[in-house]
Amino acid sequence: MAIKKFKPTSNGRRNMSVSDFAEITTDTPEKSLLSPIRKRGGRNNQGKLTVRHQGGGHKRQYRIIDFKRDKDGIPGRVATIEYDPNRSANIALVHYADGEKRYIIAPKGIKVGQEIESGENADIKLGNALPLGSIPVGTVIHNIELKPGRGGQIARSAGAEAQILGREEKYTLVRLSSGEVRLILTTCRATIGQVGNIEHELVRVGKAGRSRWKGIRPTVRGSVMNPNDHPHGGGEGRAPIGRKSPMSPWGKPTLGYKTRQRNKPSDKYIVRKRKK
């Protein structure tokens, strides 16, 4: 999928770029796999703001995605490749031989009409899902489970990939795109290939209004707030923050401060930490 650039006919268009959606084969989603999404504007069930910079945006419907890939032994055929407003990756509608339809994350290079399957005995082929123990060392994978049967949790966004490096007893060594090397149970499933729509990171929004269409509200600097709103606020004119290090709105150190819980139970599965 290529990136389309615009002529500078206005200030908003000057640096704007969009995906050309060349891979998309239909603009009509499968009705039976849609679910309503109620906008919350970053508020919790008490109406309190818990996530900043959220609100507004175009109305969406959630596409129910098959992250578990547990339909073993039943072949499926890719019917369409579709845009999903809820994620950076595209999705593929799969028609299975028993009549069921499911959405999956669309891997790079998948085509309409291609056959896919899941299970321990599936071929090592793009789009097929197998347990990590059945996938050869060196294979590029995505949509990786952390617990058997829970569904894929890692490497699901546009262009994401991981690679199998080796095996240790009942675990498989997997290198993630962050550079982290992690031990994952060999009974956990993953899908062959890299997630598609890899040019997504090259898209330039171009104007503030396009962020608002996505439901992203403005981010205000702490230094222009009042002191009761932010630790950086207050002072006369363009005052410095007046602290040893930058702070979050709640007074915690930020910008480089480590927030990962110490002695986290999953630390024992991390063989090599991610690149800084």
Swiss-Prot record:
Report the Gene3D superfamilies cross-referenced here: 2.30.30.30, Nucleic acid-binding proteins, Ribosomal protein L2, domain 3
Annotated Gene Ontology cellular components are: large ribosomal subunit
What InterPro entries has UniProt attached to this entry?
NA-bd_OB-fold, Rib_uL2_dom2, Ribosomal_uL2, Ribosomal_uL2_bac/org-type, Ribosomal_uL2_C, Ribosomal_uL2_CS, Ribosomal_uL2_dom3, Ribosomal_uL2_RNA-bd_dom
The UniProt annotation puts the region (Disordered) at 219-276
Q: Name one GO biological process term.
A: cytoplasmic translation
Looking at the keywords, is Ribosomal protein present?
yes
Give UniProt keywords alphabetically: Ribonucleoprotein, Ribosomal protein, RNA-binding, rRNA-binding
Please list which residues make up the signal peptide.
none
Any one GO molecular-function label of the UniProt entry? transferase activity
Say if the entry is tagged with keyword rRNA-binding. Answer: yes
Q: Which NCBIfam families match?
A: rplB_bact (TIGR01171)
Q: Describe the family membership recorded for this protein in Swiss-Prot or TrEMBL.
A: Belongs to the universal ribosomal protein uL2 family.
Purpose: One of the primary rRNA binding proteins. Required for association of the 30S and 50S subunits to form the 70S ribosome, for tRNA binding and peptide bond formation. It has been suggested to have peptidyltransferase activity; this is somewhat controversial. Makes several contacts with the 16S rRNA in the 70S ribosome.
Q: How does it assemble?
A: Part of the 50S ribosomal subunit. Forms a bridge to the 30S subunit in the 70S ribosome.
> Mind telling me what this protein is named?
Large ribosomal subunit protein uL2
Q: Give the classification, highest ranks.
A: Bacteria, Bacillati, Bacillota, Bacilli, Bacillales
